[in-house]
Amino acid sequence: LPEYRELKTKYDFVNMVRTPKLAAEVTLQPMRRFPLDAAIIFSDILVIPEALGQGYHFRDQGGIGMDYLLDTKTKIEALDNTKIAENLKYVADALTLSRSKLGEDTALLGFCGSPWTLACYMVEGGSTKDFVKIKQLAWDQPDLFEMLMQKLTDGIVEYLHMQIDAGADALQIFDSWGSICPATHYKTWSLRWIHHIIKELKGRVPVILYAKGMGQKVPELMQTGANILSLDWTVNLRSMRQSIGHGAAVQGNLDPVVLTMTPDITRSEALRVLDEAGDQPGFIFNLGHGMIPSAKIECVEALMEVVTGQKNA
């Protein structure tokens, strides 16, 4: 959005995340332009590692960098998850401020990264293409891997309860790197920790689970207890909804690249997604991944026209 780009000329991303007034403003900007049913808080999944003592930044050449490499037992032991609420109060404040500006009929979503996804960034030292270090840790030093995952899981549980207390109506867990797990290890390396988090939330709010590239693992994803499965664009919604039945609602799954094309292509693809989803309750239209910076406003407007028209039909 132009208004977001204007803010970015004055403040960097991390500064906006850490400043409640700015984070709330960015959260609300899309709501002023488009007839959306829900807002998602402006933040980043890496606020958890930062709260534990491992900061993050954006590399000049692109991608995410962690302030140091989590490569020894001493460094993992030093991660402190006892001050989550204190260190992440700015997120709670941003949620409360955003909630106060939204209407009663508009939901506010909080979110976090899954323990596995966060561990990938922390152990690899940031964005990577091969994920060698995190797999080596999980295989070669399972006790140390377990320690890291437990610290992350406990911190996330506290963080999500804090988000609910601050006004979040629902929560989304992003297991963005679950797809790099060997098929035989996905449950033990990632899903069991997600299951524990959802169990500890005790049904306070609905939980959405997004696992990129894991459409073939939907039966296992459902075992986490998530209320809603968020699917990427590689999944056929019709067949997936038939296999899920009433076990969970479904969210998705327009390819974000569509919004960089033309309004006509956007309308066509949006109608295709809606047709695949069918007319049964339990479907939330969304993108299959995050918005691409080069998305065109006129395409977003075309998307809103189609989805809103379908909803009101």
Model-found features: residue ranges?
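Short, flexible, mixed-charge acidic loops at enzyme active sites
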Residues: Q54-L69, Y121-I134
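Glycine-rich, proline-tolerant flexible connector loops at the mouths of alpha/beta enzymes
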Residues: A38-D60, L70, E77-I84, C112, ...
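Intrinsic-disorder/low-complexity, polar/charged segments
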Residues: T19, D71-A78, D130, T262
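Active-site loop segments of alpha/beta catalytic cores
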Residues: P2, N87-A313
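Short, basic, glycine/proline-bearing loop/turn elements
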Residues: R5-V17, K73-I84, M222
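A gly/proline- and charged-residue-enriched helix-loop-helix capping module
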Residues: Q61-K101
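Short, flexible active-site-proximal loops enriched in glycine and acidic residues
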Residues: A38, D67, A107
